[in-house]
Amino acid sequence: MQVLSCSTDSRFVHKIWQEQELSKMVGGGFPFPMLSDAGGRIGAVYGVYDEAAGVDVRGRFIIDPDGIIQAIEMLTPPVGRKVGESLRQLQAFQHVRKTKGAEVCPAGWELGKPILKVGPELVGRVWEVWKPDE
């Protein structure tokens, strides 16, 4: 797994953001590389670059080892993301990949919680296995 942050801000803005903001919000600072996409080329490839404003909108992508996008989330600038939900989804995608799709993770699934085993015996019986409130 590799996590990267990418924005149209310069590496100098990232440095100040890390030192003055993130280090106070996240113990030890942001633990992942921050990429500068000053021209918006990376953002344009992923459809998050706003050319008129010269910035990327908030986007999150989970890309599997084969380079296939498994999840996309795009938010307008005033709304932040929840890191825990991103981590939960990443763990779910990793689990499904590890089992080659023989096991799937239901909505709200968390590491260590029951999974669903794909097969005809599950049809019409999901409610017996999946208890979202537990």
Residue ranges and their predicted role:
Residues 1-134:
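Chalcogenol-based redox active-site neighborhoods
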